[in-house]
Amino acid sequence: MKVLWAALLVTFLAGCQAKVEQAVETEPEPELHQQAEWQSGQRWELALGRFWDYLRWVQTLSEQVQEELLSSQVTQELTALMDETMKELKAYKSELEEQLTPVAEETRARLSKELQAAQARLGADMEDVRGRLAQYRGEVQAMLGQSTEELRARLASHLRKLRKRLLRDADDLQKRLAVYQAGAREGAERGVSAIRERLGPLVEQGRVRAATVGSLAGQPLQERAQAWGERLRARMEEMGSRTRDRLDEVKEQVAEVRAKLEEQAQQIRLQAEAFQARLKSWFEPLVEDMQRQWAGLVEKVQAAMGTSAAPVPSDNH
């Protein structure tokens, strides 16, 4: 009887443990606080949103996902999305560093160090996701047609853990970027603690976004792409307007230069005409006097020649 009760107790405890594990497996995952920003934020956030959407699709482990996992297509897609995210993040960080020039050197160095650490953690999380999927591919290929149900369950568990860590580190990176951006906007020499005190509204805004992320998570990718296209179109129109304004300024400058050159040319012509008139007034009397002297000399020569040409009277008549 004791043995029977012990067996029943073990069976009951095993059933409870299985229910607990099933509840843990089916527990919904928290969404990223700043996912709303991925839909309407910076370019690196949009790239991270695409990585997030693709990872969520992989996590479904549908038949199509399992087929593509056996090839290198999934890891190639993740690699491209990772590279795009880190590239856009690096460009955004460089842009903020240029704006942070007026801030004290010590503050800027501390902010940059914290931001680099958060950026490295996010990159490591994405690299772990890719590495785990590559490991799963190798394990499945090594099974040689055997059941891979246990491998899929283990992969799903790892992906949930990695996804939660990715959420946490991406949220931390966004907060640190907000600190960095606030320092660039502030442009004053103050410590990191003083800047963080001014970020209370941003933290509260993140909580509000976390409360509304459930409704935003279901927004179709097409709508987000259209919104991104509209922002890009608006930016292109703004750049075109600036270019036209710059061309108008250049045209005005060219017109001013042409007017100045024409004015200077007119002044040079007037000066040349005045100088020519002055020379004429100087030399004209001399020329007239030389002409009179020459005419008188010619008359004298002609008179002298006429006298010498007259006939001499003869003595024989």
Curated annotation (Swiss-Prot):
<dbReference type="InterPro" id="IPR050163">
    <property type="entry name" value="Apolipoprotein_A1/A4/E"/>
</dbReference>
<dbReference type="GO" id="GO:0097487">
    <property type="term" value="C:multivesicular body, internal vesicle"/>
</dbReference>
<feature type="repeat" description="4">
    <location>
        <begin position="146"/>
        <end position="167"/>
    </location>
</feature>
<feature type="repeat" description="2">
    <location>
        <begin position="102"/>
        <end position="123"/>
    </location>
</feature>
<dbReference type="GO" id="GO:0034362">
    <property type="term" value="C:low-density lipoprotein particle"/>
</dbReference>
<dbReference type="GO" id="GO:0060228">
    <property type="term" value="F:phosphatidylcholine-sterol O-acyltransferase activator activity"/>
</dbReference>
<keyword id="KW-0967">Endosome</keyword>
<feature type="region of interest" description="8 X 22 AA approximate tandem repeats">
    <location>
        <begin position="80"/>
        <end position="255"/>
    </location>
</feature>
<comment type="similarity">
    <text>Belongs to the apolipoprotein A1/A4/E family.</text>
</comment>
<dbReference type="GO" id="GO:0008203">
    <property type="term" value="P:cholesterol metabolic process"/>
</dbReference>
<feature type="repeat" description="8">
    <location>
        <begin position="234"/>
        <end position="255"/>
    </location>
</feature>
<dbReference type="GO" id="GO:0032438">
    <property type="term" value="P:melanosome organization"/>
</dbReference>
<feature type="repeat" description="3">
    <location>
        <begin position="124"/>
        <end position="145"/>
    </location>
</feature>
<keyword id="KW-0813">Transport</keyword>
<keyword id="KW-0162">Chylomicron</keyword>
<feature type="repeat" description="1">
    <location>
        <begin position="80"/>
        <end position="101"/>
    </location>
</feature>
<keyword id="KW-0850">VLDL</keyword>
<dbReference type="GO" id="GO:0031175">
    <property type="term" value="P:neuron projection development"/>
</dbReference>
<dbReference type="GO" id="GO:0005615">
    <property type="term" value="C:extracellular space"/>
</dbReference>
<dbReference type="GO" id="GO:0120020">
    <property type="term" value="F:cholesterol transfer activity"/>
</dbReference>
<dbReference type="GO" id="GO:0034382">
    <property type="term" value="P:chylomicron remnant clearance"/>
</dbReference>
<feature type="signal peptide">
    <location>
        <begin position="1"/>
        <end position="18"/>
    </location>
</feature>
<dbReference type="GO" id="GO:0071831">
    <property type="term" value="P:intermediate-density lipoprotein particle clearance"/>
</dbReference>
<feature type="repeat" description="7">
    <location>
        <begin position="212"/>
        <end position="233"/>
    </location>
</feature>
<feature type="modified residue" description="Phosphoserine">
    <location>
        <position position="147"/>
    </location>
</feature>
<feature type="binding site">
    <location>
        <begin position="162"/>
        <end position="165"/>
    </location>
    <ligand>
        <name>heparin</name>
    </ligand>
</feature>
<dbReference type="GO" id="GO:0008201">
    <property type="term" value="F:heparin binding"/>
</dbReference>
<dbReference type="GO" id="GO:0042802">
    <property type="term" value="F:identical protein binding"/>
</dbReference>
<comment type="subunit">
    <text>Homotetramer. May interact with ABCA1; functionally associated with ABCA1 in the biogenesis of HDLs. May interact with APP/A4 amyloid-beta peptide; the interaction is extremely stable in vitro but its physiological significance is unclear. May interact with MAPT. May interact with MAP2. In the cerebrospinal fluid, interacts with secreted SORL1. Interacts with PMEL; this allows the loading of PMEL luminal fragment on ILVs to induce fibril nucleation.</text>
</comment>
<keyword id="KW-0358">Heparin-binding</keyword>
<keyword id="KW-0445">Lipid transport</keyword>
<feature type="modified residue" description="Methionine sulfoxide">
    <location>
        <position position="143"/>
    </location>
</feature>
<dbReference type="GO" id="GO:0042627">
    <property type="term" value="C:chylomicron"/>
</dbReference>
<dbReference type="GO" id="GO:0033700">
    <property type="term" value="P:phospholipid efflux"/>
</dbReference>
<dbReference type="InterPro" id="IPR000074">
    <property type="entry name" value="ApoA_E"/>
</dbReference>
<dbReference type="GO" id="GO:0034364">
    <property type="term" value="C:high-density lipoprotein particle"/>
</dbReference>
<dbReference type="GO" id="GO:0034363">
    <property type="term" value="C:intermediate-density lipoprotein particle"/>
</dbReference>
<dbReference type="GO" id="GO:0050750">
    <property type="term" value="F:low-density lipoprotein particle receptor binding"/>
</dbReference>
<keyword id="KW-0345">HDL</keyword>
<dbReference type="GO" id="GO:1905907">
    <property type="term" value="P:negative regulation of amyloid fibril formation"/>
</dbReference>
<dbReference type="Pfam" id="PF01442">
    <property type="entry name" value="Apolipoprotein"/>
</dbReference>
<comment type="function">
    <text>APOE is an apolipoprotein, a protein associating with lipid particles, that mainly functions in lipoprotein-mediated lipid transport between organs via the plasma and interstitial fluids. APOE is a core component of plasma lipoproteins and is involved in their production, conversion and clearance. Apolipoproteins are amphipathic molecules that interact both with lipids of the lipoprotein particle core and the aqueous environment of the plasma.</text>
</comment>
